[in-house]
Curated annotation (Swiss-Prot):
Reaction(s) the record says it catalyses: D-ribulose 5-phosphate = (2S)-2-hydroxy-3-oxobutyl phosphate + formate + H(+)
GO BP, sorted A to Z: riboflavin biosynthetic process
Residues the record lists as binding Mg(2+) 2: 28, 142
Chain's gene name: ribB
Residues annotated as site: Essential for catalytic activity: 125, 163
Protein name from the UniProt record: 3,4-dihydroxy-2-butanone 4-phosphate synthase
Biological source species: Helicobacter pylori (strain J99 / ATCC 700824)
């Protein structure tokens, strides 16, 4: 079923059709219209504005954002899902920039190899979004899903996305009859972010385990697993054996580290040592993820952590969490189930 949904969606996408892409109910729980940027037309942009009603954005890779000199919209991103907005833009030759034609013109420029940063003015009416390297395997958002679709379809990694709102202005949620009726009415295929995660996991991997050894960690004997990701960064999992070990649903604690394995200055210091006591007593996994941000002392890319758990053969797990942690969402595509959250 998943393979069929993905292959049919990719075929439609590479033929210039829009898709409805939905994320998990425990995340944004939204349906977005998604269109490959190279197939943008004024008519399709008008359709998004008229029928989807949300904010029209353009997802693209970090390389393209750098090429067009599109810096982040803010220096510290503290939005709920850390959506990576850049400064907004218009095509330089646009008048107001808001018409469907002029928004299409801006999108068209983002898709051309010859476009220069000076071809845009800032701010504007198109909102670029930078997709995480690694796509949905690094961050389970519509931004990454739309760029992944372009890459899987062999298209330039620029995608137009727009949230779908109901006629009363409320968001169209996954499971709403509105979205299924919308898809039927406009003859649109539907795809889930979890479908893309499953599809990519079947065909590629961002993570490889290259070392497994017994190692003492803070005066406790553990099994240490070392992983290398697609950016040549190391991530580590320490398995603790406790008196009350639950192999079917082990305890898991995620914690950020810096390149030099510095884990004591990356935030959640008190919670870290509380988690350590749980792990020593009950067993489980302490996973160090090399995704630390100097601006926000939190683990930002849960996708890597999910891949570590998947590589370790974990399916169900119990999360050791603290108020400094953000929620871990969109797990279904990784074959994981969070069965309990233990507050620290």
């Amino acid at each position: 079923m998943i393979l069929r949904r993905v292959t049919e969606a990719l075929e439609a996408y590479k033929n210039g059709e829009m898709l409805i892409v939905m994320d998990d109910e425990d995340r944004e729980n939204e349906g977005d219209l998604v269109l490959a940027g190279i197939f943008s037309t004024p008519e399709k942009i008008n359709f998004m504005a008229t029928h989807a009603r949300g904010l029209i954005c353009v997802s693209l890779t970090k390389d393209l954002a750098n090429k067009f000199e599109l810096p982040p919209m803010v220096s510290v991103n503290d939005s709920n899902h850390e959506t990576a907005f850049t400064v907004s833009i218009d095509a330089k030759e646009a008048k107001t920039g808001i018409s469907a034609f002029e928004r299409h013109l801006t999108i068209e420029l983002l898709c051309k190899d010859t476009t220069k940063p000076s071809d845009f003015v800032r701010p504007g009416h198109i909102f670029p979004l930078i997709a995480k390297d690694g796509g949905v395997l690094a961050r389970t958002g519509h931004t990454e899903a739309s760029v992944d679709l372009c890459k899987l379809a062999g298209l330039k990694p620029v995608s137009v996305i727009c949230e779908i709102m109901k006629e009363d202005g409320s968001m169209a949620r996954r499971g709403d009859k509105f979205l299924s009726d919308f898809a039927i009415k406009h003859n649109l295929k539907t795809l889930y972010v979890s479908d893309l995660i499953s599809y990519r996991l079947e065909n590629e991997s961002l993570l490889k385990m290259f070392c497994q050894e017994e190692r003492e960690f803070l005066k406790h004997q553990t099994q240490c697993y070392t992983f290398l990701d697609h950016q040549q960064k190391n991530h580590y999992a320490f398995k603790f054996k406790g008196a009350k070990t639950h192999d079917l649903a082990p305890l898991v604690r995620f914690h950020p580290i810096k390149e030099d394995f510095d884990f004591l200055t990356t935030g959640a210091f008190e919670a870290f040592f509380k988690a350590l006591e749980y792990l020593k007593r009950e067993g489980g996994y302490l996973i160090f993820m090399n995704t630390h941000s100097e601006q926000n002392n939190i683990v930002k890319d849960f996708g890597i952590g999910a891949l570590v758990l998947k590589n370790l053969g974990v399916k169900d797990f119990r999360l050791l969490s603290s108020c400094e942690d953000r929620q871990y969402k969109a797990l279904s595509g990784f074959g994981l189930k969070l069965v309990e959250t233990i507050s620290l």
